[in-house]
């Protein structure tokens, strides 16, 4: 398998899941390389409730968000890899490459208990600033 350098400049896809109401969640996926985002609303059974559109984001905002992740030291946090227990329940996944030979993304997940809830709240807020819209609920960070 081809090796990809795990550095901030290679960060591409950021997937953030925020809880919403009545067991629903909202997932925001942002591409820092292709400069777009999409939002999907997920019901209690895990089914996507809306059409997915790739919405462009400003290059300058994507660069600013990448710097924010660097300041937060994202790559120093404990992570899970695909196949690890809890990977699919993690609220934050980041990708830093795509292996065309293996046809898979090179990504890691930040488990819910790996960082303080205030840090997750801050990432949520910065993502809202990046995409220019609100999503999910902050109340779940206080529980």
Roles of regions detected by a PLM:
Residues 1-8, 12, 48-64:
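Negatively charged, low-complexity tracts enriched in Asp/Glu with abundant Ser/Thr
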Residues 28-30, 55-57, 94-96:
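Short, exposed beta-strand/loop patches in secreted or surface proteins that constitute
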Residues 45-47, 101-102:
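Short, cysteine-centered beta-strand-loop-beta hairpins and adjacent loop/turn segments enriched
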């Amino acid at each position: 398998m081809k090796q990809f350098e795990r550095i901030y400049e290679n960060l591409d896809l950021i997937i953030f899941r925020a809880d919403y109401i009545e067991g629903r969640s909202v997932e925001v996926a942002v591409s820092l390389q292709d400069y777009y985002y999409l939002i999907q609303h997920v019901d209690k059974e895990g089914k996507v409730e809306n059409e997915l559109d790739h919405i462009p984001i400003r290059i300058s905002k994507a660069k600013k968000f990448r710097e924010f992740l660097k300041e937060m030291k994202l790559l120093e946090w404990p992570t899970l890899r695909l196949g690890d227990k809890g990977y699919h329940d993690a609220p934050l996944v980041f990708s830093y490459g795509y292996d065309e030979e293996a046809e898979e993304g090179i990504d890691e997940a930040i488990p819910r208990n790996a960082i303080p809830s205030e840090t997750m709240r801050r990432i949520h807020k910065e993502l809202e600033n990046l995409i220019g819209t609100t999503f999910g609920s902050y109340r779940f960070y206080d529980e």
